[in-house]
Amino acid sequence: MGFSVGSFAQKAAYDSVLAAQLGADEYGMKRYVMAFLLAGDRVQEYSTEERAEIQKGHMANITNLADEGKLIVAGPFINGGEKRGIFIFDVATKEEAEALTNTDPAIKAGVLKMELVEWYGSAALMMLTDIYPKLQKKDF
C-alpha cells in the first residue's frame, strides 16, 4: 500500500460559513484564554470529605461552563503536582476568563488557583464540544 506526499498535501476547500460559525479569522484561527490550574494555598485546610465535595462542585462548574459554550477544553495533568490541569476558554480577554474562573468552587475555596494566558489557536477547537459527547462512554 503506497501513499504519495501529494495526497496529504491537498488543501480542503475553504468553508466561509463554517469559518464564520466558529469565529475564525482569515487564517482559521481565533483568540482564546488558556488557564493553567495550579494547586491552591488552602488545600490542607480541608478534610478528605470536604475536598471531595469541592471537587464535585468543580466538575459541575466545568459542565456548566461547557454547556454555556464558554469552556472548550478542560482536563487534568497526568502527574499532578503544582500544575493540576488546563482550561481553554472561548473568550478574548483575561478579564472575561477571570470572571468565569471565579465561578469555580475550587477557586473560591483556595484549593485551586489560575494562571491566565491569552492564546491564539485554531478555531477548529470550537468543534470539540460537538465531537466529545460521541466519544465519552462514562460521566465523571
Language model regions located:
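Bacterial Sec-dependent N-terminal signal peptides
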Residues: M1-A12
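Conserved, structured core segments of small domains
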Residues: Q10-F140
